[in-house]
């Protein structure tokens, strides 16, 4: 689909923000296996979905009714009686047969050649596009393209999406499972899928699907031991009546959590059991091959990876694993043939390319592989952990060493991976040296998020060495995985080792406030973090927001910000907060000057905030001028509220509510003696929706707009309607005063 912000003031502001030439902006959105933009889908382990999308330039057609990669077609009304057919070919098309039907009757037929040089047009007499059916055949008679108008019958409007019920109100364990699954799929920001799974298990702790879902969720969060308990419960129920159950997924998931705990014998059994079911054979046998390779059982590993590839020929990691196994078996020729075949399927198979390099015996990594991997640390980490998953620590180490050689600024995490690999190779002293190197490296802006990173960091934090950075990164992963207590524990260890690490103090502050309810401690930590680095504008912004949450007065907050004006100027959000505080403390002139001298850039969550402060300062100054009898100045200030200058970074939305501006404009005009104009302004100010609603988004009507409607109605003599507006606000407030807001 195509998305545009429109051509109004709001849309033109986005044109300026999003295009180099400040011209029109159209956003193309495309998708496959999906009905709409947020319709996320599932991928099974090592699954590949294949699709082709064509982006085709065309001209002169108007609105395309149907298209293929070869032809584009439009049919539209030429006048009240006739229709015009337009065709555009992307390549030469000879002997096309074009048929126009009305119901079953052919009313026009033609055979023609098309080329991209000219658009084919033909007028069909005495028919409307709604009546016409278009069929286009190639010279051999194959139907290339067809179209007919959709039925004009009124279809029922689909029901809008409904919010999930609280877990306790969901009737069945099945619906609890489906709701949790939906929340996982759409990654809902405020609802927690585990609340639904756990409620289902509270009602029936043997439920297969909810136990499996909880186990899989915990596995993805790095909680392998906890996940194992749920998965074993699922399997116990699954095998009560049949030792070879219908579904193999819980066995496969159990194999994963056991493997990540180094319980390789039990993991092997679980994966083999999963392979009883066809749906899990490709991923199950692949995992078995990894385990066999880790134990140097190369013949078994080859058999298992072959079984996996039979079920999933395009498992590119499986192909890499097979190439490695063949190399270990000394079957280099077969390995090279497999690598060539694999690269014909996917030229970006880093694993196969790395295997080719290992087999070549060359000292330096080929430049072609470096170019494809872009000297990107993350690519090397992924490749190294592929080897690690197969217990091939030597080659995993070789990948990391290649990265450290080739990348000018490798991620610190590469060093921690190297230390992990060395530990697994029983080279602890060397691992300690590498961790020391990592701890003394600059902290990069890189945040690991993989399960292997958890294992690596857990390993290095157990070494006999001072490792505050490793604990810091481990805390980051745990927080990302929503394992908040583990995150706090890791950060507290980091803090104990290095109390001068501002980012750790900042992270702990957020966790204390948001997750543990330790508000005073959160303030102390964030203040300490900022004292350690008073150049960090983000921490200053967050400290001010924390003061705001703790109900510090605007003057107290200004006292902090006034000390750091240079830093404030580096962030739009902090700069705007400073201007807002000036407005709140009556420094309207200064606030207006600050806003007027800056070019703002929109940010998500900040929509509407800059114009709001721009307008608020002017309204307050206009009120002062009105009171002082400076009517012309007051009117000029109010008129500026109706226009969004470009430096605000935003445009005015169509239908923006301006009741307050119109009301004050009327008051000024009234004071100037322009009663007719004043009455007109009051009348406009009195219009709009008079029913209060929750103002959640920046373009929702704010309740004060209704208040100004009431004031304006009073000005035009409609006292009863004015009181109605005021009473509606009071009633809404009383009704919702004690509501618990859930988003």
Regions found by a protein language model. Name each.
Residues 64-171, 344, 348-354, 358-368, ...:
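Long, contiguous interaction/recruitment modules in multidomain scaffold/adaptor proteins
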Residues 205, 239, 245, 279, ...:
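Short coil turns that delineate tetratricopeptide repeat
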Residues 193, 227, 267, 301, ...:
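Single-residue signature of alpha-solenoid repeat helices
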Residues 197, 231, 271, 305, ...:
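Hydrophobic/aromatic packing residues within the alpha-helices of TPR/SEL1-like helical repeat arrays
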Residues 1-48, 56:
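A contiguous, surface-exposed recognition patch within enzymatic or periplasmic domains that forms
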Residues 181-182, 216, 256, 290, ...:
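Residue-level recognition of tetratricopeptide repeat
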Residues 174-175, 209, 249, 283, ...:
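Start-of-helix register in tetratricopeptide repeats
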């Amino acid at each position: 689909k195509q998305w545009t912000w429109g051509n109004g003031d709001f849309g033109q502001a986005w044109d300026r923000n999003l295009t180099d030439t400040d011209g029109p902006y159209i956003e193309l959105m495309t998708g496959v296996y999906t009905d709409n933009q947020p319709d996320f889908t599932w991928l099974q382990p090592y699954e590949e979905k294949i699709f082709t999308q064509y982006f085709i330039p065309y001209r002169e057609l108007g609105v395309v009714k149907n298209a293929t990669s070869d032809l584009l077609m439009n049919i539209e009304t030429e006048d009240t009686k006739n229709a015009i057919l337009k065709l555009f070919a992307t390549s030469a098309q000879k002997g096309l047969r074009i048929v126009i039907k009305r119901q079953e009757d052919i009313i026009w037929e033609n055979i023609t050649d098309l080329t991209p040089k000219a658009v084919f047009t033909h007028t069909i007499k005495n028919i409307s596009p709604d009546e016409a059916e278009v069929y286009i055949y190639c010279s051999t008679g194959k139907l290339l393209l067809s179209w007919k108008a959709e039925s004009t019958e009124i279809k029922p409007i689909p029901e809008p999406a409904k919010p999930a019920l609280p877990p306790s109100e969901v009737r069945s364990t099945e619906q609890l499972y489906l709701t949790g699954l939906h929340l996982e799929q759409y990654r809902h920001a405020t609802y927690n899928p585990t609340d639904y799974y756990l409620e289902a298990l509270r009602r029936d702790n043997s439920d297969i699907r909810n136990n499996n879902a909880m186990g899989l969720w915990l596995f993805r969060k790095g909680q392998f031991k906890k996940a194992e308990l749920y998965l074993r419960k699922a399997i116990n129920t699954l095998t009560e009546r049949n030792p070879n159950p219908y579904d193999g997924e819980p066995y496969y998931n159990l194999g994963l959590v056991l493997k990540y705990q180094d319980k390789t014998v039990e993991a092997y059994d679980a994966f083999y059991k999963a392979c009883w079911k066809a749906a899990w054979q490709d991923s199950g046998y692949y995992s078995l091959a990894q385990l066999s390779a880790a134990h140097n059982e190369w013949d078994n590993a080859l058999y298992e990876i072959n079984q996996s590839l039979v079920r999933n020929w395009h498992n590119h990691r499986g192909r890499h694993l097979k190439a490695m196994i063949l190399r270990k078996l000394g079957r280099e020729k077969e390995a090279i043939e497999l690598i060539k075949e694999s690269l014909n399927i996917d030229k970006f198979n880093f694993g196969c390319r790395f295997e080719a390099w290992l087999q070549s015996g060359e000292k330096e990594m080929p430049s072609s592989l470096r170019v494809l991997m872009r000297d990107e640390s993350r690519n090397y980490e992924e490749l190294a952990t592929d080897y690690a998953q197969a217990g091939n620590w030597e080659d995993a180490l070789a990948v990391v060493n290649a990265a450290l050689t080739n990348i000018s600024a490798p991620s610190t995490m590469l060093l921690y991976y190297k230390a992990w690999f060395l530990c697994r190779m029983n080279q602890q002293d060397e691992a300690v040296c590498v961790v020391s190197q990592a701890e003394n490296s600059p902290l990069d802006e890189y945040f690991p998020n993989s399960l292997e990173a958890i294992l690596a960091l857990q390993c290095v934090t157990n070494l006999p060495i001072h490792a505050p950075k490793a604990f810091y990164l481990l805390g980051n992963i745990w927080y990302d995985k929503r394992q908040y207590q583990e995150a706090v524990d890791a950060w507290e260890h980091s803090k104990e080792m290095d109390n001068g690490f501002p980012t750790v103090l900042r992270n702990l502050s957020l966790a204390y406030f948001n997750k543990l309810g330790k508000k005073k401690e959160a303030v102390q930590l964030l203040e300490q973090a900022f004292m350690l680095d008073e150049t960090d504008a983000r921490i200053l912004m967050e400290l001010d927001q924390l003061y705001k949450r703790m109900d510090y007065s605007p003057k107290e907050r200004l006292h902090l910000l006034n000390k750091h004006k240079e830093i404030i100027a580096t962030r739009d959000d902090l700069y705007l907060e400073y201007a807002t505080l000036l407005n709140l403390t009556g420094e309207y002139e200064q606030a207006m000057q600050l806003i007027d001298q800056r070019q703002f850039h929109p940010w998500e969550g900040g929509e509407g905030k800059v114009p709001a402060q721009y307008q608020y300062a002017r309204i307050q100054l206009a009120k002062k001028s009105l009171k002082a009898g400076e009517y012309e100045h007051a009117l000029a200030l109010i008129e500026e509220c109706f226009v969004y200058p470009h430096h605000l970074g935003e445009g005015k939305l169509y239908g923006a509510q301006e009741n307050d501006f119109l009301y004050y404009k009327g008051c000024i005009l009234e004071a100037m003696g322009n009663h007719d104009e004043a009455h007109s302004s009051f009348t406009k100010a009195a219009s709009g929706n008079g029913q209060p609603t929750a103002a959640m988004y920046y373009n929702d009507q704010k309740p004060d707009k209704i208040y100004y409607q009431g004031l304006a109605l009073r000005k035009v003599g409609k006292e009863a309607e004015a009181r109605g507006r005021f009473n509606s606000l009071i009633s809404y407030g009383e009704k919702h005063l004690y509501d618990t807001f859930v988003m």
